[in-house]
Amino acid sequence: LHLSLRRQRQMCIRDSGVTETYIKEHYQLRAILEGAAARLCAAPETDISELEEIYQDSCKILENKDFSRYTDINREFHNEIWTAAGNGKMKNMISELWNGLSMGNMVSEEDYAKVSVKEHGEILEAIKAHDGDAAEAAMKEHIMRSRDDMLTYYN
């Protein structure tokens, strides 16, 4: 069943006209822009109270095993980082990328949520510590892991 499901997903990606190069370029650009947004968000003057609240909500989703809500809360977490970064042009560019390629239903919502919440926690801790380097690195790792997941289903 897993093999069959993987082949169906693989065919969906390939039938959409998306290439391996497109996936790599898409996620590379997201990593650069979202990494920069996380760095900006780590500035001491940035209000991250909303980001902390969204993260706590995502932890509750895990606790309650309400994984169907995770895709929305994931988007909220990322969107709040873009907003808190204070660069409207960057936010618009990242948002446009989010309207394109997505993991969608490539992995189970539960698996996706567990890994993502852990990584979001690492990003948030770096932001709270006002460590721009660590925030940027954690975000880039998070995005590139998503890229690797996508490529797993492509190949």
Residue ranges and their predicted role:
Residues L5, T19, S116:
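Short, conserved glycine- and acidic-residue-centered signature motifs
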Residues S49, D111-K114:
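Short helix-capping and inter-helix turn/linker motifs at the boundaries of alpha-helical repeat units
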Residues R14-R30:
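Basic, amphipathic "hinge/linker" alpha-helix immediately C-terminal to the N-terminal HTH DNA-binding motif
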Residues L1-I13:
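Single conserved hydrophobic/aromatic residue that forms the stacking wall/gate
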Residues H26, R30, A36, A43-M106, ...:
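Conserved amphipathic alpha-helical segments that form helical-bundle/coiled-coil interaction surfaces
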